[in-house]
Amino acid sequence: MKETPLSNCERRFLLRAIEEKKRLDGRQTYDYRNIRISFGTDYGCCIVELGKTRVLGQVSCELVSPKLNRATEGILFFNLELSQMAAPAFEPGRQSDLLVKLNRLLERCLRNSKCIDTESLCVVAGEKVWQIRVDLHLLNHDGNIIDAASIAAIVALCHFRRPDVSVQGEEVTLYTPEERDPVPLSIHHMPICVSFAFFQQGTYLLVDPNEREERVMDGLLVIAMNKHREICTIQSSGGIMLLKDQVFRCSKIAGVKVAEITELIQKALENDQRVRKEGGKFGFAESIANQRITAFKMEKAPIDTSNIEEKAEEIIAEAEPPPEVVSKPVLWTPGTAQIGEGIENSWGDLEDSEKEEEEEGGIDETVILDDTKMDTGEVSDIGSQGAPIVLSDSEEEEMIILEPEKSPKKIRAQTSANQKAPSKSQGKRRKKKRTAN
């Protein structure tokens, strides 16, 4: 599968950002991505993460016959594999030009620089020597493979332990880790590669380019150096012409970066060795326990927020006031009106109206009480007319009369009827007077 090319818009955007000294991940020109080193349960196994670029390093050893021209030296072998798991553009089982170039650069950086004492790998001169094999697997590709691979290779070699051997006459005895402690390799120094990407024919420079920056770069300069500022190898690719001052400046930057990376490697090795001695938990499972599959991880980028408030005030002062926007337009036509439009708010007058109603209610109660205070004779007359209400001097009957709401009205109606209609005795007396006359 071929690599997806960048569009013209993306290319122009990246180049313009580089001209303005800006990078997509928020780094500065000479900033490296975060480096994370984790070790496996076995010696010589590690994973190095350079940003999102991941490389797995594994070191193994075996006893073999030495080379004819170097009978007293061991053998170092490096192998870098680019699988489709890292990027779809990599083809499995095929030696691409990129893979060949990376393997050669690793051999020059680690084997030709004599960072490992190969004579200490000899067991019997001319017969048995140790062959150290370093296998590097690219797990994820996000640019700058050579830097991540060189760090993974040197970390795996420093972490590796070979079995102990003893020679008695012609007999060679190989001891297991349970019988004797494994022996570490003799390492003189740690060469580390630092990559520099050039743009616009060497006008602009970036350290540790990522995958998108590598697509638009014009040339690449790789400098392998140790913490003693000794250059192990240097390689330029891309066909650009570099000035002597540019190479010197890159070498100074590489010296600073290599010193920082070497210190990080030594701290990681010391921490792993201390955990193993104390009997604590170690391995890949412990190193990635916090990064669960279902969890999201967000990398924070530093942002300068010193002048944000001042700029915000300036923008607000310069901005024009927004026009008034009617959320719901109303169309006024003849014969239409809106309830509550133009009327004063009367919510505060509710208390006064409630007080007035209470006062009126008190007046009605006094009137009802006055009406109930009637003569006993009149009440007896009402009862003689067939009314069901009978009053007496007892307090219980008076309370029964006052409790219902309609009883006072009935009393009023009956009293008014008695006043208008004369009694039967009065009617008989009037008839007698008329007959006498």
From Swiss-Prot:
Polar residues composition-biased segments: 413-425
**Any idea which residues bear Phosphoserine here?**
S65, S306, S346, S392, S394, S407
Q: Which GO terms describe its biological process?
A: exonucleolytic trimming to generate mature 3'-end of 5.8S rRNA from tricistronic rRNA transcript (SSU-rRNA, 5.8S rRNA, LSU-rRNA); mRNA catabolic process; nuclear mRNA surveillance; nuclear polyadenylation-dependent rRNA catabolic process; nuclear-transcribed mRNA catabolic process; positive regulation of cell growth; positive regulation of transcription by RNA polymerase II; RNA catabolic process
Instruction: Specify the cross-link site (Glycyl lysine isopeptide (Lys-Gly) (interchain with G-Cter in SUMO1)).
Output: K297
Q: Which domain of life is it from?
A: Eukaryota
Q: Where is the composition biased (Basic residues)?
A: 426-437
Gene3D superfamilies recorded: GHMP Kinase, N-terminal domain (3.30.230.70)
Where exactly is the Glycyl lysine isopeptide (Lys-Gly) (interchain with G-Cter in SUMO2) cross-link placed along the chain? Answer: K297
PANTHER family the record matches? EXOSOME COMPLEX COMPONENT RRP45 (PTHR11097:SF14), EXOSOME COMPLEX EXONUCLEASE RIBOSOMAL RNA PROCESSING PROTEIN (PTHR11097)
Q: What is this protein called?
A: Exosome complex component RRP45
Protein's organism? Rattus norvegicus
